[in-house]
């Protein structure tokens, strides 16, 4: 990854239980139904603490993002793809609003209300 120095980096995050008495092996971004923008912001730099990330340009230029890990194996992954499109090609997909669309999806189709944070752009935390 260091050799490739990607233009954009997207990490996943979740609500993985942590033991406060143990050091996390991999610090992650807190995301999901129980998270909020403040918590996502506080933990967003966690993955960047891994050795080598300081050598990459993407995090330094605002091209570092996080998405809810559990999108990987369910039909909601269409919302993750919407976020990826917006983050990778912001001009072409400026009219995409994954958080707004996921909220609307919950209102129309889910038996419970939307809560939490599922997409995080440290450069635009209010859009999370």
Predicted regions, residues:
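Binding-cleft/active-site segments that stabilize strongly anionic ligands or cofactors
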Residues: 1-76, 82, 99-104, 109-127
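Periplasmic-binding protein-like
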Residues: 93-98
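Short, hydrophobic alpha-helical segments
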Residues: 85-92
